[in-house]
Amino acid sequence: MARTAEITFKEFRRRYNTEDACRAELFRLRLPNGFVCPKCGCVEYYPVHGRNIYQCRSCRHQTSVTAGTVMHRTHLPLTLWFWAIYLCATDKRGISAVQLSRTLGICYDSAWHLLDRIRTAMGQRDEKYLLSGIVELDDGYAGGPSHNGKRGRGTDKAKIVVAVSKTANSAPLFARMKVVDNVQGKTLQEIIDQYFVPKTKVECDGYRSYLNLEGVELNTKKYETDDLHWVHKAISNLKAFLQGTYHGRCTKLQAYLDEYCFRFNRRMTGNQIFLRLTRAVATSCSVLC
């Protein structure tokens, strides 16, 4: 079976049913060109039996397939990690820590830890990509119920900025979402500088904070609600995702946005999304280092 093909549930169970199989897959994904010592660059190593680590033949530096990733210093079996990755990747609705703990037979804290690290890898992976071409840009609000009864820009919900790139024929491509403290011009400019390719064509609703953005080709037309179809659809679907899976809670909202975008940006990959997410986890950077 080709590594790039979709992986079925049956194939997943067959391929990743042991610690050694999971470790070999992480080695392949993290070191596609073979072992390279992170300390001295030597390509020769030998395994330290019984400890699941590799030792450089030159400088004797020891490392593992999880060192320096979001799995750094994990005490959970790799098979549990792979199950969590598979369940998180293949369920379009996402999976909560409560459900994951029940499915895998682990405590809530372990399930929460797994999902938190996996979402971190999702966010890191999408940080590598910039939006280009034509991009719809708008701000919105997400999280639990508003306590002051207000809607729109006066609400007390968490503020988010959402961007969706699209083709010339208006087919959606990629999405980025960011939790922000405000939607002032300076904040929006920082998002443009971080997430957009220079000279990208931006469509927005004409709110004054958007009018002086630099580095992009800003369409000064005042777009109505129906004109920014994809960005508003993304915000609507995000709210349904948060409400359905996480019951609207705002805790670690940015991580939930990263999860939503990762899945949206790979919506055409079918079950390949599991392999994409496994690669993201294997090549991630530790939040502990």
Identify what each model region corresponds to.
Residues 1-289:
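Residue-level recognition of single "structural anchor" positions
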